[in-house]
Amino acid sequence: MVRHQPLQYYEPQLCLSCLTGIYGCRWKRYQRSHDDTTPWERLWFLLLTFTFGLTLTWLYFWWEVHNDYDEFNWYLYNRMGYWSDWPVPILVTTAAAFAYIAGLLVLALCHIAVGQQMNLHWLHKIGLVVILASTVVAMSAVAQLWEDEWEVLLISLQGTAPFLHVGAVAAVTMLSWIVAGQFARAERTSSQVTILCTFFTVVFALYLAPLTISSPCIMEKKDLGPKPALIGHRGAPMLAPEHTLMSFRKALEQKLYGLQADITISLDGVPFLMHDTTLRRTTNVEEEFPELARRPASMLNWTTLQRLNAGQWFLKTDPFWTASSLSPSDHREAQNQSICSLAELLELAKGNATLLLNLRDPPREHPYRSSFINVTLEAVLHSGFPQHQVMWLPSRQRPLVRKVAPGFQQTSGSKEAVASLRRGHIQRLNLRYTQVSRQELRDYASWNLSVNLYTVNAPWLFSLLWCAGVPSVTSDNSHALSQVPSPLWIMPPDEYCLMWVTADLVSFTLIVGIFVLQKWRLGGIRSYNPEQIMLSAAVRRTSRDVSIMKEKLIFSEISDGVEVSDVLSVCSDNSYDTYANSTATPVGPRGGGSHTKTLIERSGR
C-alpha cells in the first residue's frame, strides 16, 4: 500500500481570507498575491483615504451642530412648508457612511501591513464614489444655505482640539507600525528616504499643532468668571409648548434670570406671543379654520386666536424629543394650552424675571402697522412691570421708547462699533454666539456693554462661553444648563503644555522603537514561503530565481517530510527507488527525472 505525503501543507489562514475576501472578494488562496499594488489601485486607496477624511469632517460637523438642530429644522420648515426632524436621519446616514468607509480603510491598511496586493472590489468602488459624491454635494448645499453654521465647526475646535490632538498623536503612533514595515521592506535607499522624510514631516507638524490651538478654557481656575445668566428662549420650549403660560411657568421654576418673547399684534390690537408669521406650526388652525391657515397670525382678531389650541402640536411633533419625559399631569396640561397674551406674561413674570422683548412687524395692511410699538409700550407700562427689568430689542422708534420708558434696557440686535452704540444709548447687545470673539467681548465689557448670546443649548458650548466671560445666554435647554456646576473642562496653561509635550515625547519614543523593531524584523528578509512563490512570480526576484527556489523547497520538503524507509519497503520496484538511491537532480534518468518534473509541476499548480 502506498502512502502519499503531501509536499506542502497550507494552514487555513481564515483571517487573511476574510481580509482579502471582504476588501476585494478574493476568498481563495490562489486569488491572493504578494505583488506590488498597481498604480490604479493605489489611486483608489488615495481616494478612499480622502473620502475617509471628508466623511469624518462631515460627521463631526453634524455631531457638533446639534446645538442648532432646531434652527435647521425651522429653516427647512420655511422652505418646505412642513415640520420634520431632519438632522437625525442625516446624522444616522452620515455615521453609517463613515463606518463603511472607515472599515474599508482599515482593511486596506491591513493589506499593506501583511504585504498583500490591494484590489478593491468594484462594488466597493461604486459605494465609495457614491458616498464621496453625496458628501461633496451635501457639504456644498450646507455651505450655500447654512453658511454661518460652518463657524460652529471652528468654535467647537476650541473645546475639542486639545483632546483631538492627543487622539491624533495616538493614531499616528499606531500607524507608524505600517509605515515602518514599508520602510524596512524598501530595497532602494531613495524609497526609504522618501518614506522617512514624508512620515516624520507629518509627525512633527502634528507634534507642534498645539502651538496654534487657542481655547478660552485653557486658563487658570482663579480667572474663571461668574456663570452666565440664563434667559429662557420663549420660556422652556423643551418642557412645554413654546410661548405658552406653561412654558414660561416652567422657566420661572428654574429661577432663570430672564425670559425671551416674540410679540405680535392681533387685528384688533391685542399684543400676543407668537414667533412664526402664520399659525400652522404651533396651533391647530388647519383643523379649526383651514381657510385661515396661511393667513398671517396678526391678521386674526384675539377672539379667534383664543379658540386655537397651542399645545397639541408639541406632543405630536415632539421637536426636542422631550415630550415622552413629561409627567401625566404635564402631558394633560400641555395638551390644553392656548395662545398667550403679553398681558398674561407680564403678570406672571412681574418681580420674578427680566424680559427680553422682541416685536414682529405686522403686514402693511394691518390697522396697527404704524402704532404697534405704542400699543406694546402701553401694555407694558400699564401692567406695572418694572422698567429696569425690560430689555427692549426693537430698533424702530428707539428715541420715542427712551422718552416714554426711560428705564428700559435698550438692547441692540446688530453688531456695531462701540462709538455708535454709545450714541444710541445702547446698554446691551443681543447677538448670535458666532458673531462675537473673545477680544470683542473684552472690548464691550470695558465700555460697560453687556452681551447676551443666543441660542445656546449644548453644554459644551455653554462651557466655552462661560470660560470666555459671556455675561448671559438665551437657551432652549435652560433646565439642563442651570444644572451645570462648572465648565466641562478647564486646564491651566502649564498643565496643558505638560500634557501635549508628554504625549509628543512618548509618541516619538514609541515611533523610533517601532522603526528599529521593524527594521530588525524585516530588513534582512529575502526568503520566500511556498505561497509567495506560487502566487507571485516577480516579488524581489527574477523568474529564474523563483524557479530555483521552487526546486529547493520541494526537495527540502521531500527530505524532511517523506517517510523514505516506509516508501522503500513498500515500493522498492517503482520509480521511488530513484530518489532513495541517487542524489536528487532537477533533470535525471527516465524514472527519477520525469517524476521530479511531475512533482515540480504539481507544486507549481
Curated annotation (Swiss-Prot):
Membrane-crossing segments per the record: 43-63, 90-110, 126-146, 161-181, 193-213, 497-517
Catalytic activity: a 1,2-diacyl-sn-glycero-3-phospho-(1D-myo-inositol-4,5-bisphosphate) + H2O = 1D-myo-inositol 1,4,5-trisphosphate + a 1,2-diacyl-sn-glycerol + H(+); sn-glycerol 3-phosphocholine + H2O = sn-glycerol 3-phosphate + choline + H(+)
Sorted UniProt keywords: Cell projection, Cytoplasm, Disulfide bond, Glycoprotein, Hydrolase, Lipid metabolism, Membrane, Neurogenesis, Transmembrane, Transmembrane helix
Domain GP-PDE per the UniProt entry, residue ranges: 228-485
Record-listed E.C. numbers: 3.1.4.2, 3.1.4.11
Signal peptide limits: none
GO MF annotations, alphabetized: glycerophosphocholine phosphodiesterase activity; glycerophosphodiester phosphodiesterase activity; phosphatidylinositol-4,5-bisphosphate phospholipase C activity
Gene Ontology cellular component terms for the protein in this record: endomembrane system; growth cone; perinuclear region of cytoplasm; plasma membrane
Extracellular side: 64-89, 147-160, 214-496
Disordered: region residues: 582-605
Membrane topology of the entry: Multi-pass membrane protein
Sugar-bearing residue positions: N301, N336, N352, N374, N448
Keyword Ligase attached: no
Annotated GO biological process: lipid metabolic process; nervous system development; positive regulation of neuron differentiation
Cysteine disulfide links: C15-C18, C25-C571
Family: Belongs to the glycerophosphoryl diester phosphodiesterase family.
Assembly behavior: Interacts with PRDX1; forms a mixed-disulfide with PRDX1, leading to disrupt intramolecular disulfide bond between Cys-25 and Cys-571.
Protein name: Glycerophosphodiester phosphodiesterase domain-containing protein 5
Organism: Homo sapiens (Human)
Gene that specifies this protein: GDPD5
